Design a protein with these regions (language model features):
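Amphipathic alpha-helical effector-binding/dimerization core
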Residues: 1-34
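Generic alpha-helical structural context detector
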Residues: 17-21, 56, 118, 122
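Generic secondary-structure transition motif, activating predominantly at the C-termini of alpha-helices
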Residues: 23, 35-36, 55, 59
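Intrinsically disordered, low-complexity polar/acidic regions
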Residues: 40-41
């Protein structure tokens, strides 16, 4: 159970990872360098190197995940939302108990969330076709 208003750490939260993965490299590096990689449990990413690898995988998949990295038995899948400048400005996600939101379904769920994120992004002026940028392929 997550208490209302709970703030997840940047290195554990799928919505944060979804945005960070698509930030410009300079801003991304500043944020990554500022993180204290606190261990919450055995699933937590605890090194900068592992976190950077996770962000690279996020870009490759088009969605970010949280595999019970802060709260045991809680998974999350998230996709970024972009503005007209191709900047990630928000995320959309689904969170659930790990027995119901299982890794085998992450690709399917990521695709569904990605479709919604693309619709929202387009409403904000995001036009990936004009410059070859797309997180939702």
């Amino acid at each position: 159970m997550v208490d209302p208003g709970h703030n997840f750490a940047l290195h554990t939260a799928a919505p944060a990872k979804a945005m960070l993965a698509y930030m410009n490299p300079e801003d991304q590096a500043k944020i990554i360098d500022s993180i204290t990689y606190t261990r919450y449990n055995e699933n937590t990413i605890i090194t900068k190197r592992s976190f950077v690898k996770n962000l690279k995988e996020t870009r490759e998949k088009g969605y970010a995940t949280d595999l019970a990295e802060e709260i045991i038995n809680l998974h999350c899948v998230a996709c970024p939302i972009f503005n007209h400048k191709l900047e990630p400005i928000a995320s959309i996600w689904i969170t659930g108990p790990s027995d119901r939101l299982q890794p085998e379904r992450f690709d399917e769920i990521g695709e569904i969330i990605g479709e919604s994120a693309l619709k929202i992004s387009r409403r904000l002026g995001y036009e990936p076709e004009l410059n070859g940028h797309s997180a939702y392929e």
